[in-house]
Amino acid sequence: MAVYAVGDLQGCLQPLKCLLEQVAFDPAQDQLWLVGDLVNRGPQSLETLRFLYSIRHALTCVLGNHDLHLLAVAHNIERLKKGDTLREILDAPDRDDLLDWLRLQKLVHHDAERQITLVHAGIPPQWSLAKALKRAAEVEEVLRDDARLPLFLDGMYGNEPAKWNKDLHGVTRLRVITNYFTRMRFCTADGTLDLKSKEGVGSAPPGFAPWFSHPQRKMRGEKIIFGHWAALDGNCQEPGLYALDTGCVWGGAMTLLNVDSGALHRCTCPKQ
């Protein structure tokens, strides 16, 4: 059995299939891990979700910010934005099956056998693996709760609070957890977020740095696979960290990692 991890899909199905063909992926015996942002911006968001649903027995996904945005739009909490390519999903006859499956996915996945963690944006420097999994579980529980889900989706958007505090409660608490796992790029050593800067490492605001570069990061030395930050183009210069968002939807490439061997495969993508 081989385990492969792939960066942000964002509704780009053909590059994914190209990569799976390159490695002769067999869903009957192999496993596919995805770093989230499965949909949006690319031309095949519906077809991508349907394909993933068809191989869900061989799939491990974590949720990204675009996936959560889809859930918010589907629940009439948020409106479609310019550039969104989610309408086909919303109008699809099988939308409920697809969306119910989507909200069962995790924010953070840890493979104990391989000692490697999968997350969309990253793990804040002040959290250990145990704390990250515990905080992620708080949001995952709400996503699966029909009664609590709308309130969470309604309060999910926003950049404040910019820093975790154990005394936070309610949707405010869930928002900062979600922002860490699905939107983070730059932060301070104590986990204060800057969510406005989206360019490369050199664009860090004064006092901020990439989440993975803080010397006292609790998970330093542990393996993490993440996406979200296309401007890194796969290069974060940190041992054991694999940045897999290489900007497919922006005309870059889609990247696949053999989790066990470390081998990388790329498929170039047309700009959408």
Curated annotation (Swiss-Prot):
It is an enzyme of class 3 (hydrolase). Its EC number is 3.6.1.41. It holds the Pfam family Metallophos. Keywords: Hydrolase. Signal peptide: none annotated. Gene3D superfamilies: 3.60.21.10. One of its GO terms (molecular function) is bis(5'-nucleosyl)-tetraphosphatase (symmetrical) activity. It catalyses: P(1),P(4)-bis(5'-adenosyl) tetraphosphate + H2O = 2 ADP + 2 H(+). InterPro entries: ApaH, Calcineurin-like_PHP_ApaH, Metallo-depent_PP-like. The keyword Membrane does not apply. It comes from the Bacteria. SUPFAM superfamilies: Metallo-dependent phosphatases. PANTHER family: CYTOCHROME C5 (PTHR40942:SF4), PTHR40942. Hydrolyzes diadenosine 5',5'''-P1,P4-tetraphosphate to yield ADP. Belongs to the Ap4A hydrolase family. HAMAP family: ApaH. This is Bis(5'-nucleosyl)-tetraphosphatase, symmetrical. It comes from Ectopseudomonas mendocina (strain ymp) (Pseudomonas mendocina). The gene is apaH.
